[in-house]
Amino acid sequence: MSGAVLLCLFFSINVGNIQWDLRYIPILLAFLYGGKRAGWGVAAIAVVGRIGQGGDLFLLGVVLIVLTALFYALCVNRFYMLPPRWSRIRYASLLVILPATIQTFGTLYLINYENHLSESWVAGWLYIVFLVVTVVLVTYLFETLLEKERIVAELVATEKDFTKGELAASIAHEVRNPLTVVKGFVQLLSEDKQHAEYHKLILSELDRAESIIYEFLNTTRPQTNATFHLNETAREVVALLTPYAQERSIQLTIGTCEQAIVNGNENKVKQALMNFVKNGIEASNEGDTVTIQLDRLKDRAQIEINDNGVGMSRQQLKQLGTAYFTTKESGNGIGTMVSIRIVEMMNGMVTFKSKPGKGTKVVLSLPIEKENE
């Protein structure tokens, strides 16, 4: 994108003092598909290129590039929450129209072409239309390529899940049998009071091993989907975990939105929500509040879980969701991995934001069932 923005600047069409170019397209695409860091990098290169060009209106051009980059940085998060392809294409088109319109007609007003004012305005409108058409075509290409990558990734994941499911079921069966036998004999020996503590420890570890097997199997079992009300599910989770929070002097609050009906496995969604909320409770300090906020963004439902706990470093965030990684004194990290997988199997998405000592935000995004809107 850095090279593209320079090409757009130096291979522009100049009519009098007006420079017609496509500089905003590489900047926009860098923000949308590369993130804020890439977007600001491309914008900085565009500023350097515009200064190098000089001209009577170079200062205005620099200011417009900076303001446009700031505008894109503020709007880019919304783009990530939109479903792929057409919703994103429409949003990208709107993002390019505003700065292009301000630049085009603002420049025309400042220059005030008295002799060819009507022709300049026509040229301005044609320029904006050309920008929008170009953005639509380029964004469509990006979205098509990303969609193909997603399809290939899903096919590979499905094949892996099938193989993993068969292997997991076989391993679980073979491991559970000796565990059951050992557990039975330990329970018989528990009458020996002399070693009662040892018996409790053994039983506890056997229960933990069985729990790990159960959680691992959950990642491979196919889902039975049905429509359900996400607000009600979230309220049930809060009701179930309120006593657990009160034991630790933690307050749970929930804010719901207009009714959001989603299609999926309600029990598994409840399991995922309980895991994330429980993690927030366990990471919080006495007297803290854990908030659960539901919002509806067009055709997606969003659940935010915020805590003011210990937080996580950037390195810990990268490892989050991998098996056997946990920031807690006890636990194995499989619960978080399973919860993320549950949401992803519903075409949803889980994102984490956290800083050490400043708490953690977990955002779940799920598609809303269109037939029931």
Swiss-Prot record:
It comes from Bacillus sp. (strain B21-2). SMART domains: HATPase_c (SM00387), HisKA (SM00388). The chain crosses the membrane at residues 27-47, 57-77, 91-111, 122-142. Residues 170-370 form the Histidine kinase domain. PANTHER family: C4-DICARBOXYLATE TRANSPORT SENSOR PROTEIN DCTB, SENSOR HISTIDINE KINASE. Its main location: membrane. The lineage of its organism: Bacteria, Bacillati, Bacillota, Bacilli, Bacillales. It catalyses: ATP + protein L-histidine = ADP + protein N-phospho-L-histidine. One of its GO terms (cellular component) is plasma membrane. InterPro entries: HATPase_C_sf, His_kinase_dom, HisK_dim/P_dom, HisK_dim/P_sf, Sig_transdc_His_kin-like_C. Involved in a sensory transduction pathway that enhances the production of minor proteases. One of its GO terms (molecular function) is phosphorelay sensor kinase activity. This is Sensor protein DegM. Gene3D superfamilies: 1.10.287.130, Histidine kinase-like ATPase, C-terminal domain. PROSITE patterns: HIS_KIN. Its EC number is 2.7.13.3. It is found in: Cell membrane. It is a multi-pass membrane protein. The keyword ATP-binding applies. The modification Phosphohistidine is found at residue 173. Keywords: ATP-binding, Cell membrane, Kinase, Membrane, Nucleotide-binding, Phosphoprotein, Transferase, Transmembrane, Transmembrane helix, Two-component regulatory system.
